[in-house]
């Protein structure tokens, strides 16, 4: 979040409103785990693997810290929870398995293919697990997972988010990026479902450059 700069003025410091970005947030590594282009949290979760259609996708959730950083960046947990949970490392493999199951279901819907009952069962089992407590801090309401059960509880939230989308009429609007092996999913809310790319500044731009090259190569 960008900080406003204002001209110096005399104020009553006791009446100042707290800054929106606390010290804890400024200490979190700033490297972006994945861009938020899916339009829904569950789809952004799916997009934490690059080149998702490749035999070996580019994994962004490499460890517990990278998952916590992503969860903070998308607003799933607050900065304070990031540091609290960082000291209670959990395996990231079950989280990645859940993500991949959500992705396969979303991909099947986008491609109009048969959905795996095994994947749906995995989503259901995670969604039925206990969810975190909720806390209100400053001007936000966030999940507050128990340190020793954070993986299970956050997985329950993500699975619930996924099922809320996949079981809704909006599921038919799930699209897949046409940028080669990208495979990122998004909710196509355009008129006539004409969206083709995860991001026009990324895969869309490369496709445009490729068309330009092919056109002028023939001249």
Language model features with spans:
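Short helix-coil boundary/hinge micro-motifs
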Residues: 1-176, 183
């Amino acid at each position: 979040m960008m900080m406003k700069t204002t001209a110096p003025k005399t104020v009553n410091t006791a009446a100042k409103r707290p800054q929106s970005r606390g010290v804890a947030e400024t200490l979190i590594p700033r490297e972006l785990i994945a861009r938020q282009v899916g339009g829904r949290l569950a789809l952004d979760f799916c997009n934490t693997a690059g080149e998702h259609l490749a035999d070996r996708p580019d994994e962004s959730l490499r460890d517990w810290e990278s998952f916590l950083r992503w969860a903070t960046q998308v607003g799933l947990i607050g900065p304070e929870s990031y540091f609290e949970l960082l000291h209670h490392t959990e395996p990231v493999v079950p989280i990645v398995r859940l993500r991949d199951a959500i992705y396969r279901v979303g991909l099947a819907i986008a491609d109009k293919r048969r959905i795996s009952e095994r994947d749906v069962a995995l989503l259901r089992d995670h969604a039925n697990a206990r969810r975190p407590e909720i806390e209100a801090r400053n001007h936000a309401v966030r999940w507050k997972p128990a340190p020793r059960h954070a993986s299970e509880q956050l997985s329950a939230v993500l699975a619930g988010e996924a099922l809320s989308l996949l079981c809704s009429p909006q599921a038919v609007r799930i699209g897949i990026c046409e940028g080669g092996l990208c495979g990122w999913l998004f909710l196509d809310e355009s008129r006539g479902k004409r969206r083709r790319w995860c991001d026009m500044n990324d895969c869309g731009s490369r496709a445009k450059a490729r068309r330009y090259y092919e056109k002028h190569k023939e001249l």
